[in-house]
């Protein structure tokens, strides 16, 4: 039986402009945000992603972005955690989905990867049917 990984390769030299949803701040996470971010991920997602995000927070510069509204975390996205050029993990709180937050977090990471000198990024599982973000990923 053939194995399908579902990874997607994205050309980061051809990205649309970055834009955050109205009222939402997308920012690079700092080590001081660690406890708040890890608590958010554990509450809304799972421990494995929290461990990966912690690795992203320890890198210099950090490779994790968060979306906040009124000081409350709505989502997160990381890159260069499991491998260089690799996007993820990422997640948006269920009640905040459908507002373009995931797209903005993705673009923040892809633009950061471009500025780091990458020409391409790998989105793990980007084309798998169960990936809620695959419709966004397929635009590039």
Regions found by a protein language model. Give the residues of each.
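Acyl-donor-binding surface of acyltransferase catalytic domains
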Residues: 1-22
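A short beta-loop-alpha structural element at the N-terminal edge
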Residues: 24-36
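Short acidic/polar active-site loop segments enriched in Thr and Asp
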Residues: 119
